[in-house]
Amino acid sequence: MQKARDVSFRNATAEDVLEISIGTGPCERATLTIVVRSDLGHILYSYVAPFKQHVADWDVPELDKEARQFVDGLISQGVESTASLPPWEEPDAYEEKHAGRIEVSREVYEKLRAKPRPMMSHPTYHEGWKSVVYDERAGEAVVVVTGGV
């Protein structure tokens, strides 16, 4: 199963593409692949992991339906804005309140909130996630926050 849609990831006007696929076969062997490509086809961000770790019950007869729902949800909601980031808090307070950890400096975090830009968020396991932005100067994606329970 594979889906793609146009998104802006590098900046608010970039013409990029978000591609999400789950390989065929039983859940315990299927691979989840998330890729964001530029309009020229360059990989801006990629994530590859066993799909099994992203679902609660992988030993269910309706796994195909669950996989479709997973892909549909991520393809429609995966790219958001750094404007949605909560205000900066000290690490312990942030983790307590948001079940997450800020992975960039306070200065960078507050700049991302003050000047919103596209941000890709996706699960990293059943109850975990990460959010990344593209740093055009560095030419790579940067993890802003990670979280999970």
What are these regions (language model features)?
Residues 1-149:
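Exposed acidic/polar residues on beta-strands and adjacent loops within beta-sheet cores, strongest
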